[in-house]
Amino acid sequence: MREQKDLGLLILRVAGFLLVFTFGIQKIGWYWSALHAGKSFSSIGLAPLIAKMGFPIPVALAIWITFNESIGAFLIGCGFLTRLLAASLALGMAGALYTSVRLGEDWLRAALYLIIFITLILTGPGKFSLDHLLKCKKSPGAC
């Protein structure tokens, strides 16, 4: 039974990574294009939307969101720092859910991602993860 739970958590982690990572890569593309066009981060991508909605430090928030959805999602897929990064992504998805509802846009995707990351906060990454491997290496009796 434990193996099935761990396999389910692996599938959930990898699915969460694949679904969210596509948005992170898209955002990296926006910023890469902006840099090559001589534009600033504040003029392209998420930062103008964040500023328009009245959130503070829009450039920093845009960079944090991009990190979450790219590197953070990849590390969750690997099962590394899972709970910490899932908490960061859940916070970002809560913001995306709020923004989607406020703008009258489709909010279901943000809600689904939020559920995935809250589940990973509560359960942890499971046995098939780098977190588990590092835990076993540090304390062999705990595995």
List each language-model region with its residue ranges.
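Extended, low-polarity transmembrane helix blocks
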Residues: M1-A37, A51, P56-F67, I71, ...
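Extracytoplasmic catalytic/substrate-binding loops of multi-pass membrane glycan-assembly enzymes
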Residues: G38-S43
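Cytosolic, membrane-interface loops and tails of multi-pass inner-membrane proteins
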Residues: I44-I50
